[in-house]
């Protein structure tokens, strides 16, 4: 149902877009005011009788009349606006645009032998089933504070992150969502912040079955996993798609914090060469499962290690072989680091990853990997803050030749944003330890200070 800007005016309905009048702006079509503050769902309390305009026409005329009144039909959940009554049909109309007979295209209707005698108002019983989840919750939850603004769907699970003032209503919210959302069997609430080793959500079951093994699709790719034991955020699907679209067949992807594979599996399906890693044994198990399910095992190697260990072992070995034995100008090499709470802390693992001798014979036109690291930033100028975080942990400044972009991903909380910082690794980064670079910079600053003092004397 689309929102109409002015309910008091008759609205022109285009053939391309089907706009209907918003029922929640019409008091008569709202749930009873008596349900406000309800904490235990009582579906029978939502019953009410309303009067709505109607046309009653012979059955033989319905097909000719419907195109004339289609834009005025009363649209509600589980309500058929055209109903059989004896040998005729009752067409229920929306009370906002239709106040009386003259609100309708009377001349066109009269040509079909429908006149004012066919128009009247009828009693209509509305029930819990006739309102959407949003309409039910809007009528129940307190008006003085923000209601339920969003939730995530992962397969048959609805995942909430309720604020404190909504916790007394959590059972009701869970029941309403399970009732109203298609194929929803389980409703959970985020019980605490993500602070465990494996960075997965701590969940509280508030309604439905304690079944957390889900099947879902992201950007056309099927995934299966236990939502209670791994990290999965459907709000990142667009970002996953952005990265995968950057990749071409035969490109290389090193996925340091792969999870169950939202970057790695689509990349492997595109016939990229993928090395994927995750510390969580459950994520690793489902990563393997999803690779097998999507028939991309030949294109992906998987490991179950700490991200730093993966960088200094698998990534180091594979990248060295590619840099030394292949033409890196013919394909792209990408490194994804999607662990925004701490991924930047792993950037120093790239510093001094190789000795100068190991990379001494590389051609001058060698193409080094592009790193896509995700991070949270909290404050006023979050874009600048996230750049500083990356440069500080990397121990290097990112000039215009190295920095590929700082891209906003999503707002997480007030003044807290998630970003992707994309940058090129360089020969200097890969062959110089972070501590050496910092010492060199400090020494240069001290030399400059001494020189300045000498000039002043």
From Swiss-Prot:
GO BP field: mitochondrial tRNA methylation; tRNA N1-guanine methylation
EC number: 2.1.1.228
Reactions catalysed: guanosine(37) in tRNA + S-adenosyl-L-methionine = N(1)-methylguanosine(37) in tRNA + S-adenosyl-L-homocysteine + H(+)
Gene3D superfamilies in alphabetical order: Met-10+ protein-like domains (3.30.300.110), Vaccinia Virus protein VP39 (3.40.50.150)
Entry-linked InterPro entries: MeTrfase_TRM5/TYW2, SAM-dependent_MTases_sf, TRM5-TYW2-like_MTfase, TRM5/TYW2-like_N, tRNA_Gua_MeTrfase_euk
Amino acids binding S-adenosyl-L-methionine: 240, 278-279, 306-307, 338
Enzyme category, top tier: transferase
Compartments where located: Mitochondrion matrix; Nucleus; Cytoplasm
Record-level Gene Ontology MF annotations: tRNA (guanine(37)-N1)-methyltransferase activity; tRNA methyltransferase activity
Broad class of where this protein is predominantly found: mitochondrion
Keyword Methyltransferase in annotation: yes
Cellular component terms (Gene Ontology): cytoplasm; mitochondrial matrix; nucleus
Family per record: Belongs to the class I-like SAM-binding methyltransferase superfamily. TRM5/TYW2 family.
PANTHER family: TRNA (GUANINE(37)-N1)-METHYLTRANSFERASE, TRNA METHYLTRANSFERASE
Protein name per its UniProtKB record: tRNA (guanine(37)-N(1))-methyltransferase
